[in-house]
Swiss-Prot record:
Species per Swiss-Prot/TrEMBL record: Bacillus pumilus (strain SAFR-032)
Domain of life where this protein originates: Bacteria
Similarity comment: family membership: Belongs to the SpoVG family.
Pfam families to which the protein is assigned, alphabetical: SpoVG
Biological process according to GO: asexual sporulation; division septum assembly; sporulation resulting in formation of a cellular spore
Keyword annotations from UniProtKB, A to Z: Cell cycle, Cell division, Septation, Sporulation
Keyword Cell division: yes
Name the record gives this protein: Putative septation protein SpoVG
Described purpose of this protein according to its UniProt entry: Essential for sporulation. Interferes with or is a negative regulator of the pathway leading to asymmetric septation.
Amino acid sequence: MEVTDVRLRRVNTDGRMRAIASITLDHEFVVHDIRVIDGNNGLFVAMPSKRTPDGEFRDIAHPINSSTRGKIQDAVLNEYHRLGEEEETIEYEEAGAS
């Protein structure tokens, strides 16, 4: 299984969520609402979940082994960092243009 596409939208909130992503697996299956969270030990990827009536969060979809989780996390965080570098370049270009 390979992550063949990552679509990511950065969010600017007061909380710890930094972005929301959708991934495509093997050009055949899409998973939406994956979140990039700024945790105590750095960024991590949280799979889509819903709140149960008793207040617990349950994953809607999630990898069943650490290798697959690693592939998903690497793909999403690489895209997150790539977009951050693009934004920095745009900000520097705009600052230099005036």
